[in-house]
């Protein structure tokens, strides 16, 4: 018999620590790219971790100048080591790429097993026909991209957002008003790092999104300015174009601006191409609700086709209802609230509601309502100022 002793065994997995997040995982799609033999095949997604990753793929400024430029922009805004998928497409339009049935956007999401959170689409070719202030292809792609993104969310259970490069900018006055649209999974960015350019600095935007937690507005001043030392709207600097910037912002475009007293450039806001009163009319709301949807799906999937203890009238027994609600709320609070991604009261940022009067025996359907508590954002701050005197 062994000598008497006390043995301590360390248990693991009790803290409920959430796994590493892929919230900022994006795909950068560049139309008009050139293949590089077996190392970089068009239509195939490649994961990179910095500009140096392009060397092994055979991607250079000589064969893919626009792609190299955008990857450099991306990593100027976020740390090297941040994963990014790049996809080169030989030719075509944004509209054709985003087509749910005949384009490549849905197959891209499928091929990456739903990992992607957003798809950023740029084009290295000429802007082509301009309509309502920017390239006609961009405007025609927006509703098509919305349909594809909704398909990914509703059918593939892989919700995404799509950002289109607002190419061929001509004037803010003639821009289509995106705030009148209903594309709450689509955004359009304008403004570039070069004067009189057909392009938009979508790599800068992608990097800022990837570097920001889901609840953080890309224009948050406390996060500091964007990296470019000069940014342009058409042929003039953003500094000299603030009237046009305001007009474009009011029409729902993602666009850089300046703040008096601060150096550098900041995004005005993070609008999607829809009515700003839409619950998901901002990228922060879109990313927040999509993450909650992914977590809820993964949690509830465990219960699919499981036996459910019922009452005599076919309704769920109360302990079962409570356990389901607790499981969903715990998953959301562990993976979101504890990260500061939801507004918390008493440690919880969500509420899961299951109507206990549902006749599950008759319908085999259980309706679940999940509500998460978002943050508010100070989009306007009004400060009244005057003199402090004995008369007041």
Q: Could you describe each region identified by the protein language model?
A:
Residues 20-22, 166-167, 194-198, 356-366:
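Short, ordered beta-strand-loop transition motifs
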Residues 313-371:
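C-terminal structured domain segments
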Residues 1-174:
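Small-residue-rich
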Residues 2-33, 232-252, 256-258, 349-351, ...:
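Anaerobic metallocofactor- and corrinoid-dependent redox/one-carbon enzyme cores
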Residues 116-245:
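Conserved, well-structured core segments that form the ligand-binding/active-site neighborhood
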Residues 208-327, 369-392:
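Long, contiguous, structured domain-core segments that constitute the functional module of a protein
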Residues 84, 89, 95, 345-392:
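Compositionally biased, low-complexity/repeat regions
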Residues 57, 70-77, 295, 299, ...:
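Residues that form generic nucleotide/phosphate-binding pockets
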């Amino acid at each position: 018999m062994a000598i008497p002793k006390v043995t301590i065994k360390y248990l693991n997995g009790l803290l409920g620590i959430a796994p590493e997040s892929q919230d900022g995982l994006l795909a950068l799609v560049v139309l008009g790219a050139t293949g590089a033999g077996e190392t970089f095949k068009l239509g195939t997604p490649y994961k990179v971790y910095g500009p140096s990753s392009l060397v092994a793929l055979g991607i250079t400024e000589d064969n893919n100048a626009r792609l190299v430029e955008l990857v450099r922009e991306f990593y100027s805004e976020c740390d090297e080591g941040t994963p990014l998928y790049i996809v080169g497409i030989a030719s075509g339009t944004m509209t054709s790429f985003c087509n749910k049935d005949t384009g490549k956007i849905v197959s891209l999401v499928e091929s990456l097993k739903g990992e992607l959170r957003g798809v950023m689409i740029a084009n290295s070719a000429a802007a082509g026909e301009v309509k309502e202030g920017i390239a006609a292809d961009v405007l025609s792609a927006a509703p098509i991209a919305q349909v594809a993104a909704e398909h990914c969310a509703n059918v593939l259970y892989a919700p995404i957002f799509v950002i289109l490069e607002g190419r061929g900018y001509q004037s803010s006055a003639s821009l289509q008003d995106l705030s009148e649209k209903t594309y709450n999974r689509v955004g359009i960015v304008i403004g570039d790092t070069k004067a009189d350019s057909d392009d938009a600095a979508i790599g800068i935007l992608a990097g800022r999104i990837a570097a920001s937690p889901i609840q953080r507005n890309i224009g948050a001043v406390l996060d500091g300015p964007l990296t470019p030392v000069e940014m342009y709207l058409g042929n003039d600097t953003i500094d000299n174009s603030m009237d046009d910037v305001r007009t474009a912002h009011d029409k729902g475009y993602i666009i850089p601006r300046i703040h008096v007293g601060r150096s550098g450039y900041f995004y005005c806001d993070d609008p999607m191409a829809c009515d700003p009163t839409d619950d998901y009319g901002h990228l922060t709301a879109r990313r927040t609700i999509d993450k909650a949807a992914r977590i809820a799906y993964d949690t509830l999937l465990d219960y699919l086709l499981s036996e459910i203890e019922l009452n005599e009238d076919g309704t769920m027994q109360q302990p079962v209802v409570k356990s389901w609600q607790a499981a969903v709320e715990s998953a959301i609070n562990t993976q979101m609230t504890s990260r500061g991604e939801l507004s918390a009261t008493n440690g919880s940022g969500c509420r899961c509601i299951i109507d206990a009067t549902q006749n599950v025996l008759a319908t085999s359907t259980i309706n679940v309502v999940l509500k998460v508590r978002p943050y508010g954002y100070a989009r306007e701050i009004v400060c009244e100022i005057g003199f402090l005197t004995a008369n007041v």
